[in-house]
Amino acid sequence: DVYKRQILAREDKDLHADIVIGVPDSSLSAAIGYAEEAGIPFETGLIKNRYVGRTFIQPTQAMRDRSVRLKLSPVSSVVKGKSIVMIDDSIVRGTTSRRIVQLLKDAGATQVHVRIASPVITSPCFYGVDTSTKDQLIGAQMSVEEIRDYIHADTLRFMTEEEMKEATHGVGLCLACFNGEYCTKLFSYQEELDK
């Protein structure tokens, strides 16, 4: 994990920002490591409501939107007037990222540079995460630039699949949601219907 966050910061040598923040809780270690590697101060810029669960797994868009509004609050005294690097672990549907960027800008952030500590999710996960079709995944529908525009980030960068392999040494790593290469044969209803 330490190496992973160093790799993400390594590519941003020309990025000038005032602070680095992480989206609680899953990306805090990546944000701290990014800040150390980039030489940019880490700050707590978002406070999490501990009584709201994972937003991207809510069954409807309306529920996801409501959960995001309840889940995170920006710390205005930390973000106001600052150019921010915001680290998150992934972008699944884009709902959470879009709302967080807007929250930070509404709280006075001058710029929000989003860095994602995983590759673009382009394929469904059939191993326990509620993303059963590609049409639910923003990464399967849009380019990185289109995602950046959609979430209103000033810049956006994802870790590449190669960087993830390098950071984790590829040991026991499932990359199916990033590259569509599943480690088990998947059942196809369509193939059965076509028989």
What is the role of each PLM region?
Residues 2-3:
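Short, small-residue-biased leader/transition segments that mark boundaries at the very start
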Residues 8, 20, 34, 112:
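Conserved hydrophobic/aromatic pocket- or pore-lining residues that grip, position, or stack substrates
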Residues 15-26:
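Short glycine-rich phosphate-binding loop at a beta-alpha junction
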Residues 19, 85, 113-115:
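A structural signal for isolated positions on well-ordered beta-strands in alpha/beta enzyme cores
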Residues 25, 33-35:
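Active-site diphosphate/adenylate-binding microenvironment
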Residues 39-85, 95, 122-132:
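Short, glycine/charge-rich flexible loops or terminal/linker lids adjacent to PRPP-binding catalytic cores
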Residues 84-104:
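A phosphate-binding catalytic loop at a beta-strand-loop-alpha-helix junction
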Residues 102-195:
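PRPP-dependent phosphoribosyltransferase catalytic core
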